[in-house]
Amino acid sequence: MAKNIKFDIEARDGLKRGVDALANAVKVTLGPKGRNVIIGKSFGGPTVTKDGVTVAKEIELQDPLENMGAQMVKEVASKTNDLAGDGTTTATVLAQAIVKEGLKNVAAGANPMDLKRGIDKAVEAIVADLTKQAKVVGSDSEKIKQIASISANNDEVIGELIANAFAKVGKEGVITVEEAKGTDTYVDVVEGMQFDRGYLSPYFVTNPEKMDAELENPYILLYDKKVSSLKELLPVLEPVAQSGKPLLIIAEDVDGEALSTLVVNKLRGALKIAAVKAPGFGDRRKAMLEDIAILTGGTVISEERGFTLENTTIEMLGTAKRVTIDKDNTTIVSGAGEADMIKNRVNQIKGQMEASTSDYDKEKLQERLAKLAGGVAVLYVGAASEVEMKEKKDRVDDALHATRAAVEEGIVAGGGVALLRAKNVLKDIKADNADEATGIQIVSRAVEAPLRTIVENAGLEGSVVVAKVAEGSGDFGYNAKTDEYVDMLKAGIIDPKKVTRVALENAASVAGMILTTECALVEIKEENAGGGQMGGGMPGMM
């Protein structure tokens, strides 16, 4: 494919046009009075959204050079979304501001490499100041509600639900978002450890109305192989039957003679018993069995460890306060495992998460962590129409990620105030030359952009409000929702520090690349050679 080569100002100007096209479409969504963007699809109905990254992902420009600029800023939005879960619009606005100021100076003869060094120094100083500004959230329900509400575009109902979910499962817990069947939005919390395996036979059911099996204070046998013959199980069944307690068998599988005999014993009332398959596959199954063993104070019966069913004693079985099994899931509540052992296992899983490079593995480890340490909450999102459902679900996802980020790194004043306050530290940075000093100034001006955009979206003059907020100190800022100057933290207008930090770092990174671009290679689209139409087949032929 032939390439068109663009140099110098021509290359950078083309990239800038692309940056502006994408950023202008995204930034209308910023702030409490941000507008909606409607996205037409070639199939299905249009999507209405106020989510920056959703808008960014849909943008493809016709001019290939402009499209490269747009794709670079799209990368800012996507990466910010991946790392922090929110702040995509802020990141896009910052990138546009740095590119705009930077290209002015490059056109005036500044050295792009020195500008970039100045920008990097300024960003480092601002991030350090944001860390000083940050306040710890911990498990403060009110703060969690405020953060979630803001990220869900000032929807206090969603904020309340997410705060409730966090209160119930803790920061180690897993909160997932599902579509509700009706129009109500609500939280459903699963206490204890739940895994997606149901009873192996409906004859194990103890509650025919609900079609589930409930075992009170059962013994739990954990076995990593298949159980086919009853003879293997007898050494365990006899002492359990004498104790009068129920028994739950979790094994790779239970079939044949073993399963039919267990069912007969259950139906005769000789033994309260249920059997389920072990969760997961391969190595993950072994790890999850070990998790259940630690949670219930039992031992996994595994030949790898020198244990067989024949020499299993009742002391090797786990116990729990209650186990509920339906056709799809098993839930173990209040396992009798030692707190120290559970804590060590949690730390071990956290270490594996940090070392893992696979998103899938991390997600599975996070699920295991939640089942051990916290619990699982499902946030069901209800809406009257499919379009509203999609939009609401996007907002709930954003709010959830922002809340996690806040719990992780703390909160700062929202509404663009934290960045505006942080720019005061830039006066003390020593620049090695004039162009580096200009790079620092570029960031100093760019950090005003989020507040300016919020104000302009509210229909007011950005410069006036920015000047007034800059005169103030601490958390003094502008509440665009009520058109008042307030203490941002007291008014509940807060941002997760992680979101603000990641947005600035990603914006500066991509803007720096655009500023230091001297040449762009663009593919020349070849016109299709005028070939004849394909001949028609016989009628009715596919």
Curated annotation (Swiss-Prot):
Q: What is its EC number?
A: 5.6.1.7
Pfam families registered for this protein in UniProt: Cpn60_TCP1
GO BP, one annotated term:
protein refolding
Q: Does the keyword Chaperone belong to this entry? A: yes
Where found? Answer: Cytoplasm
The entry's ATP-binding residues are: 29-32, 50, 86-90, 415, 495
Q: What does this protein do?
A: Together with its co-chaperonin GroES, plays an essential role in assisting protein folding. The GroEL-GroES system forms a nano-cage that allows encapsulation of the non-native substrate proteins and provides a physical environment optimized to promote and accelerate protein folding.
Q: Which family does it belong to?
A: Belongs to the chaperonin (HSP60) family.
- List the protein's name: Chaperonin GroEL
Q: Which organism is it from?
A: Flavobacterium psychrophilum (strain ATCC 49511 / DSM 21280 / CIP 103535 / JIP02/86)
Gene encoding this chain? groEL
